[in-house]
């Protein structure tokens, strides 16, 4: 039994807090809004993010960060990627000894092109014992209903990953695998949000399953190209944190990236979409970062480029789809052949 702090009282942080509580751990769920924390402690609910869900008594809400961190050795980092550096700066000021951080946010930082684990390592320095990444096809709305869910964990220190695997594993509904390919696990989890935005746009435009299947398949090729250019194992993209996460995010109404894309496809502007969502849409920032990184590395990512033009250059979504369809002829398996040839 562990005392574990979960930083970020949104849907995913709350869902993981529930898993940990079900596993017998004492969970301190931190959020910066006092009224939300009061609701968690007094009503055992978090209605804005997970309506209708009762939270276990083992979850205690905190709005005081240092109090939430007092004496804990394991911290689950579930804040949006844009808030990671500022939150970790505050975390450092509270610590008396190094901690293990379980990073569960998915994204790549624009400008620096850092993955989440790299951001954590940079910000924490000597205060970091280990960083473990948890990723996979896992909508919070289904986890809190205790529906079967499977994820993977990865770390530069696989002994730490196995310890986190044990802490999160629930034999009734939450299965955890290990995967030593940290780069692949993070890239797959981050870039699937880009393709989910594109899939939502396709659905919003009224295109059917054929178009979405093509976006998912060719999107996976883009993810693998960029991931392997960064040093990932191509087989990771055939697993939970690759095609698994891609499928669930591109096909479910629970996906905020898909929902945002759907509204864009129906003609709404990006600012209007983000305001109406009321929650972070990680794929927007990740599209910018992946676009920049692909240019830097010379990796072809036509879907990402088309989405970038829609999000940041005002291109009409239908015109973006038309431009993808009008691309020159090519051999479908060139991507895979080149990737595996580079591994030899």
Curated annotation (Swiss-Prot):
Keyword terms, alphabetized: Cytoplasm, Lipid biosynthesis, Lipid metabolism, NAD, NADP, Nucleotide-binding, Oxidoreductase, Phospholipid biosynthesis, Phospholipid metabolism
Residues at the active site: 192 (proton acceptor)
Highest taxon, organism lineage: Bacteria
Subcellular location: Cytoplasm
Gene Ontology CC: cytosol
Pathway assigned in UniProt: Membrane lipid metabolism; glycerophospholipid metabolism
Residues annotated to bind NADPH: 11-12, 32-33, 106, 140, 256, 280, 282
EC number of the protein: 1.1.1.94
Residues bound to sn-glycerol 3-phosphate: 106, 136, 138, 192, 245, 255-257
Reported function: Catalyzes the reduction of the glycolytic intermediate dihydroxyacetone phosphate (DHAP) to sn-glycerol 3-phosphate (G3P), the key precursor for phospholipid synthesis.
Name of the protein described by the UniProt record: Glycerol-3-phosphate dehydrogenase [NAD(P)+]
Annotated family: Belongs to the NAD-dependent glycerol-3-phosphate dehydrogenase family.
InterPro entries reported for this sequence: 6-PGluconate_DH-like_C_sf, 6PGD_dom2, G3P_DH_NAD-dep, G3P_DH_NAD-dep_C, G3P_DH_NAD-dep_N, NAD(P)-bd_dom_sf
EC top class named in words: oxidoreductase
GO MF annotation list: glycerol-3-phosphate dehydrogenase [NAD(P)+] activity; NAD binding
Gene Ontology biological-process entries: carbohydrate metabolic process; glycerol-3-phosphate biosynthetic process; glycerol-3-phosphate catabolic process; glycerophospholipid metabolic process; phospholipid biosynthetic process
HAMAP family attached to this UniProt entry: NAD_Glyc3P_dehydrog (MF_00394)
SUPFAM superfamilies membership: 6-phosphogluconate dehydrogenase C-terminal domain-like, NAD(P)-binding Rossmann-fold domains
Gene3D superfamilies hit by this protein: N-(1-d-carboxylethyl)-l-norvaline Dehydrogenase, domain 2, NAD(P)-binding Rossmann-like Domain
């Amino acid at each position: 039994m562990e005392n574990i702090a979960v930083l970020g009282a949104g849907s995913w942080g709350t869902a993981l807090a529930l898993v940990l509580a079900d596993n017998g751990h004492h969970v301190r769920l931190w959020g910066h809004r006092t009224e939300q924390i009061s609701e968690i402690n007094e009503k055992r609910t978090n209605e804005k993010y997970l309506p209708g869900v009762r939270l276990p008594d083992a979850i205690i809400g905190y709005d005081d960060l240092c109090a939430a961190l007092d004496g804990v050795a394991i911290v689950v980092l579930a804040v949006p990627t844009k808030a990671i550096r500022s939150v970790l700066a505050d975390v450092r000021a509270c610590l008396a000894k190094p901690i293990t951080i379980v990073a569960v946010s998915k994204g790549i930082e624009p400008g620096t092109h850092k993955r989440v684990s790299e951001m954590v390592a940079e910000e924490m320095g000597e205060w970091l014992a280990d960083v473990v990444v948890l990723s996979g096809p896992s909508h919070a709305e289904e986890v809190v209903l205790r529906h079967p869910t499977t994820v993977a964990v990865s770390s530069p220190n696989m002994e730490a990953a196995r310890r986190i695997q044990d802490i999160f594993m629930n034999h009734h509904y939450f299965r955890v695998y290990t995967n030593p390919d940290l780069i692949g696990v993070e890239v797959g989890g981050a870039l699937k949000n880009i393709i989910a935005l594109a899939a939502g746009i396709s659905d919003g435009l009224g295109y059917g399953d054929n178009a979405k299947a093509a976006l998912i398949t060719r999107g996976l090729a883009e993810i693998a190209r960029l991931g392997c250019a960064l040093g990932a194992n191509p087989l990771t993209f055939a697993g939970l944190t690759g095609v698994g996460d891609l499928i669930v995010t591109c096909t479910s109404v629970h996906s905020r990236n898909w929902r945002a894309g759907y509204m864009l496809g129906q003609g709404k502007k990006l600012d209007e979409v983000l305001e109406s969502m009321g929650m972070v849409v990680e794929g927007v920032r990740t599209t910018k970062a992946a676009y920049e990184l692909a240019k830097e590395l010379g990796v072809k990512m036509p879907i990402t480029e088309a989405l970038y033009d829609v999000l940041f250059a005002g291109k009409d979504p239908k015109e973006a789809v038309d431009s993808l369809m009008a691309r020159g002829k090519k051999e479908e398996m060139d991507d895979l052949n080149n990737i595996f040839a580079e591994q030899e």
